[in-house]
Amino acid sequence: MTPAQHERIQALCTEFRLPTIGAEVVKRFQADQQGPALETLLAVFELEASDRRQRRVDRLRRASKLPAGKTWESLDRSRFPAKLQQQLEELATGRFVDQTTNVLAFGLPGTGKTHAMAALADRLIEKRRSVLFVPTFKLVQDLLAAKRDLDLPRALRKLDHFEVLILDDLGYLKQRADEAEVLFTLIAERYERRSIIVTSNRVFSQWEEIFQSPMATAAAIDRIVHHSVITEFDVPSYRTA
């Protein structure tokens, strides 16, 4: 057994939270001249590690509430401009999550922005990132209900468990003042701490209709855009193609 294999066994034991086994198993097997048995043990450990990772991915995918079928493989990226394709490829690395960067996807209905962001999320889940996909209007109603029950802080903490929160179709429905308030609270809570992905048919100049006042609109845009990647889906609608 090679030194690299020894290190791999120790690394896997650390991953399994079995540090004592990691420290002792190689020494004891070698002392008993059980090299082939160590190789078998490594193979079993690798199988266990692979199975654990897949189970975690499956759990993350179930928790994400992503729309079915919107995967990276099913996304026809060739219909997008070269710049957008490059942006999506970079976002798929997941580095933006480490940097708590936000992503904004603008485009008319049918241009593929929701599919693209859901597909991006699916790729992130494969990298064992936690993601939640939710229509903005539904999340706003859930937060309003929590606020009425004096439970808004707990609801926000629950959302904080997700590294990436996808707000789909921001501005699809006009917000009332109380709805705009909880939406702004959510954005402010995640600012520079967790990433938000926003899809919207509305450009920034129309966001005052969402947040109800120039001051709240400017503050919301500032927090979302401060660390962000802006993607523009300037392509024909696939629904009319």
Where are these regions (language model features)?
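Intrinsically disordered, low-complexity and often Lys/Arg-enriched segments
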Residues: 1-11, 241
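Walker A/P-loop nucleotide-binding motif
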Residues: 100-116
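Conserved post-Walker A coupling segment in P-loop NTPases
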Residues: 100-104, 120-123, 127-143
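Phosphate-binding P-loop
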Residues: 92-100
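Interdomain "pre-motor" coupling segment immediately N-terminal to P-loop NTPase/helicase cores
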Residues: 10, 14-67
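N-terminal pre-Walker A segment at the start of P-loop NTPase domains
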Residues: 70-92
